Amino acid sequence: LGDVYKRQPYFISSHPGCTLRDAVELSEFLRDIGHQPEQVQDFIPTPGSASTAMYYSGINPETGKKVFAARNPHDKAMQRALMQYKNPKNRQLVKEALQQTNRGDLIGDDEKCLLKISSSHNPKARHSKIAFNHKMNKRR
């Protein structure tokens, strides 16, 4: 009695219905509100939940519409990494996710960028950014 408990918010990544593009949008929102979650948990199917039904069936039980559910460990890792994009360990996964979603605009030194390429940290970075943007523009 009388103990004070600290609430620790956490996020669940790879929730059924969440695509990689959705995860990028969430990362932008987290950046905009200045929040970097310390704890992120991958979605784990649990018996009796609508989310689990969506995960296994690929269908939203409320709407009957198809939903995406990340099942591949690498896809799940990219969604998780995006929520903690400032963590240096997630750098490669964040870069890959941004490339897959054609969001090269979030790689660079602008304040809105999720993945910084500051030339002071990496002398090859500026060339890499130019090459990446050129590659993305050719795809469009």
Protein language model regions, located:
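Short, small-residue-biased leader/transition segments that mark boundaries at the very start
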Residues: 1-5
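Conserved strand-turn element in the central/C-terminal portion of the radical SAM core barrel
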Residues: 6-20, 41-46
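Catalytic cores of alpha/beta
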Residues: 16-31
